[in-house]
Amino acid sequence: MKMKRFFAAAVAASLSASLIACGSGNNTSDTAANQTNGTSQQTTTSAAAGQSEETTAGTCQYVDNEDPYTVVMGYIGLEKPDEVMIENAINEILEKELNAKLDLKCFSWGEFVQKIQLSLTGTDKLDIVPVMVNTAPGYVASGLVLDLKELIDTYGTNIKKYVDPDFINSPNINGYIYGVTPMDEQISWQGVIMRRDLLEEAGYTVNDETDMCEEITSLEDLTEVMAKVQEKHPEMTMMCSSAAGTPLVHWDAMDKLTDGFGVLMDYGQSTEVVNLYETEELKAFVQTMKEWNEAGYFSKDAITTTTSITEQVMTGKYFAYMTTMKAGAVTQDELSSKMDLAGAAIFGNPVLTSNSVNFLTWGIGRNCENPARTMKVLDYIYGSPEVMNLLCWGIEGTHYKFVDKEQGIIDYVDGQDGTTSGWMMGLGWQFPNQEIAYTAAPDTPAKWDYQHELIDTAVRSKALGFSYDSSSLVNELTALANVKNQYFDMLGSGNVDDVDAVLKEFNDALYTAGLQKVIDEKQRQLDEWLATQGSTAE
């Protein structure tokens, strides 16, 4: 969980680079070329148009020739020394079951956007591709990933068994299915995590079963808490913040419609695309951040420090941090920080949006030589506890030990943690189906029951399943990202003298950069999509 939240910030920071890369003219000869795939071909020009070829019912244009095949699977993280050991263990299974092998390829946190882009536009073999919600439009427009609809229909037995039908259909642009959603914590809400000892010292109660403080339900409540804690501990900083990691990153009372340039307010219950930065809700949030800043709740380097939120928490000098809340979020962060923590939901109920469901999906790259076998391997992983445990946790006795074998609860082997383990690195959320793998202590398998309850009761954005095609807006989105980078952190930490004046300056710059064109195009595409769903814009 900790790594997923770090990853979200990395994606946001890389958005501008990804927009530039995906719009750099790679949809020319490469896109028009036919890629030979065993006994069949796939035309990437039709992919760029967001259209799949017509096929006879019950058939698929991709046919598996059953020859030995090695699937290169990219993932995003820190390269670990025991990767080959994990591959060998997985391949003992895959060679027997599918006459296939898996070759894992790590893309580092700081370079994954650029490195994956280079692999897809070049000649590198990259069969299974981690596709981010922000990079998907460029990949589809440039034909860098395949349309998976036929492949899922034909070979996706486990995918259709484990993945919610709405989630299968969600990663699409104009009907082009570009990825498969991993079964992790798709449901999310934004909140705050705090030092439990200081919270209880201030007179608040924490639910031991959920690790949540139900007395704190708003920014106003949190402001009151921080005032009490600061009075007792003036030497401490109340709220963590960093460059590209201010609290505004986690204010999420809207459906961002991929990039946040034109959103649906009221948690996606409105279908009118509006400028977030002109809303009264955004203004009120920034005003609160200004009050926090003036009260000394942020550190003096809140918008310049490159020290991660996790590293700040581990110093013991900070009280709280904004974060994305998921089932088991508090216990995961307790493991990494070695502190007793408590959470609070201060921005409303759990919400399902295309952004949350499509945050990371698994696509198939255009250079894949055998899409059918690749999909078979991907589908097998979705249904194999053995392979998923190897991907998530490694090898028993080497990387993990059982705490409760009957319940499938594991922990690091003695003397190891996330920094010293040769493999176990907290990336279960990223791999295809974490739900069928073991559970890391102190969580229990009941975590997944809670997860499904949240999904069943969550507010679903009226645009869930909609992803807009931004291929005609690359220049505008690049300019908008540059403008946002100039203002976002100062607004997000309240580091402004006059909220109204800075917001006006920010909005003027956004409109000059082309925001209205983006909003209009999003609204047009959303209205067309809603018409196919039996809904109309409000």
Language-model segment annotations:
Residues A9-A10, L15, L19-E538:
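Extracytoplasmic/secretory soluble proteins
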Residues M1-A10:
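Bacterial Sec-dependent N-terminal signal peptides
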